[in-house]
């Protein structure tokens, strides 16, 4: 089942490692980096990179105490954040598309071209 969940999470723009670590935190609660290294067997540097990605995606939270502990937000909150981020990127692409179409259509040489291609 976890493999299926990881695959589904990936459709939300989450890497396999992020999905796996998120599920670990969702199942275990608060953990330190050292505890996550022990649980997953992954290098500490990879855990830090993955945690930073999950923090950027608002899928986990970190404590203000030392040692820092990380915990997963609820799956609903995490997926809502992922959907909002994807929607933002889609809106950015739409704006860029409009700007590119206008720029290309404004070119002086464009006005004299036909709509078809000649080879």
Language-model segment annotations:
Residues 26-32:
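Short capping segments at the starts of secondary-structure elements
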Residues 35-40:
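A short acidic, leucine-rich amphipathic alpha-helix
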Residues 3-18, 32, 64-85:
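Short, cationic-aromatic polyanion-contact patches
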Residues 33-34, 45:
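Residues within helix-turn-helix
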